[in-house]
Amino acid sequence: MKQYLELLNDVVTNGLTKGDRTGTGTKAVFARQYRHNLADGFPLLTTKKLHFKSIANELIWMLSGNTNIKWLNENGVKIWDEWATEDGDLGPVYGEQWTAWPTKDGGTINQIDYMVHTLKTNPNSRRILFHGWNVEYLPDETKSPQENARNGKQALPPCHLLYQAFVHDGHLSMQLYIRSSDVFLGLPYNTAALALLTHMLAQQCDLIPHEIIVTTGDTHAYSNHMEQIRTQLARTPKKLPELVIKRKPASIYDYKFEDFEIVGYDADPSIKADVAI
């Protein structure tokens, strides 16, 4: 994806030096956007190999409403381990807000159900979206992620926080807003997960997956990722792979990792980098 490499270069070339919550330091730009037509392939980076199993299983986990890392660990995903309590709890993070947003009368709202239903029954609606930014549960920045989770708060606030759908002539496009985007580690995963979700929703609603748009707020590269970014920028993008979904499950919640196949993924070696905690 040429657009992604251009964004990487933009951040390291034009980014302002800033401090951050983790104490690592970043170079950051504000308010960026790129688009990808899914007819041109599945946006899994080819300039470094990505672990598609982690991307798919994390999305499946979030859609299930689960907020404990036990299932992730059992399915080969470790990306949330640093923020969980000793019992694996993350507090009311993504999945709970997506599928069980609390209401004043003690009930909950499933935003994913709303999105699927509206895509099927009123695809011209301008209200087809879901998000995870529930101010009541945002973490106290003076406390650790584990303390926040124990106190009923989110271990981390949502970074990829708002998803909106747009339907035209039977084609589904999705836009994602990311308030805080780690361009080297996080953004490639978020982009692929958005594309996967678009394919899943399109299949469930008998639509054709069309375009994804990623909009980022604080768009940053950590100071300890600069060498890795230079390595990636020196590589040449290859042809993107294709996504095959092998069956149509009964609902958006019934997909399994084995339902997905990435065909023709030819990527350069992965590039290791430390996560800022």
From Swiss-Prot:
Residue positions binding (6R)-5,10-methylene-5,6,7,8-tetrahydrofolate: H51, D182, A276
Entry's Gene Ontology BP terms: dTMP biosynthetic process; dTTP biosynthetic process; methylation
Active site positions: C159
Chief location bin: cytoplasm
Record's subcellular location: Cytoplasm
Binding-site residues, dUMP: R21, R126, R127, R179, S180, S181, D182, N190, H220, A221, Y222
Single GO term (MF): thymidylate synthase activity
Pfam families membership: Thymidylat_synt
SUPFAM superfamilies on file: Thymidylate synthase/dCMP hydroxymethylase (SSF55831)
This protein's record includes keyword Mitochondrion: no
Keywords, comma-separated and alphabetical: Cytoplasm, Methyltransferase, Nucleotide biosynthesis, Transferase
GO CC, alphabetical: cytosol
Catalytic function, reaction form: dUMP + (6R)-5,10-methylene-5,6,7,8-tetrahydrofolate = 7,8-dihydrofolate + dTMP
Family per similarity comment: Belongs to the thymidylate synthase family. Bacterial-type ThyA subfamily.
Record's subunit section: Homodimer.
Function: Catalyzes the reductive methylation of 2'-deoxyuridine-5'-monophosphate (dUMP) to 2'-deoxythymidine-5'-monophosphate (dTMP) while utilizing 5,10-methylenetetrahydrofolate (mTHF) as the methyl donor and reductant in the reaction, yielding dihydrofolate (DHF) as a by-product. This enzymatic reaction provides an intracellular de novo source of dTMP, an essential precursor for DNA biosynthesis.
Alphabetical list of NCBIfam families matching this protein: PRK01827.1-3, thym_sym
Protein name in the entry: Thymidylate synthase
Species for this entry: Pseudomonas fluorescens (strain SBW25)
Gene of this entry: thyA
